[in-house]
């Protein structure tokens, strides 16, 4: 069952990217990238992880715009993917990009400190 949830998640990720970039006309929704979609084992709930280009205010406005368009997005997913029941969608920010950048910065700093000691 987990394999099917992963396949549905990947298909939803592809379709959501298209829907958000082409179909949503809300000016609050700017440069959004769908980074991951986690679907529950029973295919009832989908958590969509997004990254947004901009400051914190733009991120919050984008989240509000996506929440407002949630019904439309869900109906579009239902038309594009053949499932018995379209999963409930929730949007969350993907913090892994910032976390990865912080780790990269720390590794570069450690590398510089190591070269100074030699």
Swiss-Prot record:
<dbReference type="GO" id="GO:0030490">
    <property type="term" value="P:maturation of SSU-rRNA"/>
</dbReference>
<comment type="subunit">
    <text>Monomer. Binds 30S ribosomal subunits, but not 50S ribosomal subunits or 70S ribosomes.</text>
</comment>
<dbReference type="InterPro" id="IPR000238">
    <property type="entry name" value="RbfA"/>
</dbReference>
<protein>
    <recommendedName>
        <fullName>Ribosome-binding factor A</fullName>
    </recommendedName>
</protein>
<dbReference type="GO" id="GO:0005829">
    <property type="term" value="C:cytosol"/>
</dbReference>
<dbReference type="InterPro" id="IPR020053">
    <property type="entry name" value="Ribosome-bd_factorA_CS"/>
</dbReference>
<keyword id="KW-0690">Ribosome biogenesis</keyword>
<dbReference type="InterPro" id="IPR023799">
    <property type="entry name" value="RbfA_dom_sf"/>
</dbReference>
<dbReference type="GO" id="GO:0043024">
    <property type="term" value="F:ribosomal small subunit binding"/>
</dbReference>
<comment type="similarity">
    <text>Belongs to the RbfA family.</text>
</comment>
<keyword id="KW-0963">Cytoplasm</keyword>
<dbReference type="InterPro" id="IPR015946">
    <property type="entry name" value="KH_dom-like_a/b"/>
</dbReference>
<dbReference type="Pfam" id="PF02033">
    <property type="entry name" value="RBFA"/>
</dbReference>
<comment type="function">
    <text>One of several proteins that assist in the late maturation steps of the functional core of the 30S ribosomal subunit. Associates with free 30S ribosomal subunits (but not with 30S subunits that are part of 70S ribosomes or polysomes). Required for efficient processing of 16S rRNA. May interact with the 5'-terminal helix region of 16S rRNA.</text>
</comment>
